[in-house]
């Protein structure tokens, strides 16, 4: 019961004093008072607050949190006071004090300071203007450290001449510790840049020797510590830097000799390796400045090589070192030409021994307050002006001297080029040829060719020699294709040169025999299939009958066959249809001229690449059928006029003049062989004026004639004037220039196909093209008899006018030779009589003639000879006599 009572009680039991306990005792030893008969006193319940305080289950208050709340409250009050104070204008002293306090607080934080935005930091620094204050000097120190570190990190061979003046712009006297620490750290991180850092240190040493001495002291101490700790990496970096400082004559060569003897005194693998590296860097300088030291060092190496028990790798390193010495350090010069920036007489050499007591002045690495800060800054400004001023004058003098010397060198070089240009080119080609021929595989060949120094402007010789060597092989070797591919993919320069070589060799491919041509084509096929050169080079190819030769067509054939082998027809077709490259293939697949398109289709089909011509075939099918120049156009219109004859008749009292104009519209579908028929529609207007009765008669006539179309379609325009005397004969003068046999006819409106039987008289005609308004296609055989006055060509056609009873002769002022047959277009539509001879039947030609006669109609004439220009049939020479 007592346990249950204790558990249910809400009253905290007080802590017992030491030595006592409230643990329950045995019931025997416990004494109880006798029960009281009086009633128990009345108790009051305690208030809730008191009970919670006395309750053991209530949460206890954390004193640390209470302290934190009080601190935050105080901070808020302080911020409130600051805001209240900020409302009031602050004096300059108060601003300075506030800025200094804030800056000091940021610098003294345990984490090194929190990040401050640059704008806020600049504003904070701008508020601190007291140069004698510690805060201002600390800010200047931080800025100096960042500037020196940044300049050292970005120095290289090309900009060292510009970095050094900027470096002198900083206070290197105050920051010499920062300079030495930064340059040693950068050199250890990048050993290949050691010559550059040594050159920079040498330049600084000429003006500020204390900086160079401090750097050398720290390097020696660093080497000592690393040697004792067996730190190989630090030893290598330190000895490399010391070696290049010896080359620049900042350190004496005796220091390098001491280090070498120390490393080789008790040779181990690591010490010998470090000594070999140091000797390779400083060996040439030792050979020049102290030959006995160099001899002693190499004797020690020789003894180690023969006697010491060292690793094979280290033995090989020593052997390589002796080979480097034998080659006179051609790959390890003491000072490179671009880093030889200091004259020997200007350099200050520090003689510091390896065992000397050295003070590294580590206190220069950290900030220290300088009470005379302004005086020291002014002193360095004067020193800087002196250094940079002298440097600028020297630079100007050096520039003048270099300009003069460069002009002289250029003149000498030009003279040398003029004297030895051909020799140099031959030597270069010989070197490239021997390099290619002596290589085992293409990778070795590319490696050797990359080492060849090509003179400026002779870079195209390398691709040219590769292609020439490839062409001289009996069969194509993939060796050359792989070389060209590797060079084209290494640099864009070689890719452009190979593309230019493609255009050059395609233009001159006719100079090569078939075997060399095949090798060149396969070489470029390999280059194109591997995308080593761009496919746009094919824009130089124009595949047509006029711009290609047999050699170029063979070249294109072999090229596409090689592309088909490497890519396959499907991929090759896809490449040829590439929208980006399509303009470059317009010459290969021409669409501008149907003749060129057919030629390209036939060419690719003949070499087995007809699949590439599908687009051209489709284009050719979809072309509108053009008006063939040799065929008369359908629904074409032609106007023809012929001024026919001015004739006078002796029996008549007056003169008669007649003019006739005939306009015809013809439709003549032509066929290839056999009889060709044309349906022509003509309309003629005739106007006749006679002496006795002057009247005008316009006689529109429409006629249709079907006559065979001659093979040669010609167009002629004739102006004829005929004068008919009163006698039997009428003479007509025709100004009809004859037409050529092979010509083109344009705008023939009425093709008439009439064959006129041969006449008895013959007229001589010139071989020339005749232009007449009378367009006819009738074949007129020559006359049999020769008339002295009739020297022109006669053209006969059947017109709608009544036939004359008397024959008239036409005399032409021009005398065409009888060899060729002129063209004539006739608008007459009367059916022509059939030819009388079988020869006329075989040789009849289709012609469209439009004739307009200006002779008055005569009723008493049985046969009519008009002055139309109808091509005669082709006969023998005897027919014209």
Curated annotation (Swiss-Prot):
Bias kind Basic residues: ranges: 29-46, 670-680, 726-743, 861-875
Q: Does the keyword Secreted apply?
A: no
What's a BP term from Gene Ontology annotated to this protein? mRNA splicing, via spliceosome
Q: Which Gene3D superfamilies match?
A: 1.25.40.180
Q: Where in the cell is it found?
A: Cytoplasm; Nucleus
Q: Which InterPro entries match?
A: ARM-type_fold, CWC22_splicing_factor, Initiation_fac_eIF4g_MI, MIF4G-like_typ-3
Q: Where is this region: Disordered?
A: 1-98, 387-420, 623-881
Q: Which domain of life is it from?
A: Eukaryota
Q: Where are the annotated coiled coils located?
A: none
Q: Which residues does UniProt assign to the signal peptide?
A: none
Record carries keyword ATP-binding: no
Q: Write out the biased-composition intervals (Basic and acidic residues).
A: 51-98
Which keywords, in A-to-Z order, does the entry hold? Cytoplasm, mRNA processing, mRNA splicing, Nucleus, Spliceosome
Give the MIF4G domain ranges. 145-328
Compositional bias segments (type: Acidic residues): 391-413
List membrane-spanning regions: none
GO cellular component terms, semicolon-separated: catalytic step 2 spliceosome; cytoplasm
Sequence ranges of Low complexity compositional bias? 641-669, 681-710, 748-757, 772-781
**Which part of the chain is the MI domain?**
427-543
Q: Which GO terms describe its molecular function?
A: RNA binding
**Subunit details:** Associated with the spliceosome.
Family designation: Belongs to the CWC22 family.
Q: Which PANTHER family match?
A: CELL CYCLE CONTROL PROTEIN CWF22-RELATED, PRE-MRNA-SPLICING FACTOR CWC22 HOMOLOG
Function noted in UniProt = Involved in pre-mRNA splicing.
Task: Quote the protein name from its UniProt record.
Answer: Pre-mRNA-splicing factor cwc22
Give the species: Aspergillus fumigatus (strain ATCC MYA-4609 / CBS 101355 / FGSC A1100 / Af293)
- Kindly list the organism's lineage: Eukaryota, Fungi, Dikarya, Ascomycota, Pezizomycotina
